């Protein structure tokens, strides 16, 4: 199990990302716009830099929903490799069968 503080920190990051998503998107649209003047782009870039670092989605880390483990994460299932294996062996994931050849 991952430390509770790390899992909570990640939840807080996700919350911050959601809170600032619209603002970040608007500023990025101005920065990438060909119609905006150089001054407008520069000001938008400064505003984007003033936003909290944790509002950037790339700072997030995928974690297992059950254990909070950050490594060995399978996006399709939202589980770490250990819990994915357990769930597969118990038949809890429909359509997933152990490979055999």
Curated annotation (Swiss-Prot):
InterPro entries: Ribosomal_uS14, Ribosomal_uS14_bac/plastid. GO terms for cellular component: cytoplasm; small ribosomal subunit. The keyword Lipoprotein does not apply. The keyword Mitochondrion does not apply. It holds the Pfam family Ribosomal_S14. Belongs to the universal ribosomal protein uS14 family. Part of the 30S ribosomal subunit. Contacts proteins S3 and S10. This is Small ribosomal subunit protein uS14. It comes from Alkalilimnicola ehrlichii (strain ATCC BAA-1101 / DSM 17681 / MLHE-1). The gene is rpsN.
């Amino acid at each position: 199990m991952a430390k509770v503080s790390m899992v909570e920190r990640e939840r807080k990051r996700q919350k911050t990302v959601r809170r600032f998503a619209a603002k970040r998107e608007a500023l990025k649209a101005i920065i990438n716009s060909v119609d905006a003047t150089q001054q407008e782009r520069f000001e938008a870039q400064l505003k984007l830099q003033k936003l909290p670092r944790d509002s950037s989605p790339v700072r997030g880390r995928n974690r297992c929903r059950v254990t909070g483990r950050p490594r060995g994460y399978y996006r399709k299932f939202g589980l770490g490799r250990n819990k994915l294996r357990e769930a597969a062996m118990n038949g809890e994931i429909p359509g997933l069968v152990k490979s055999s050849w």
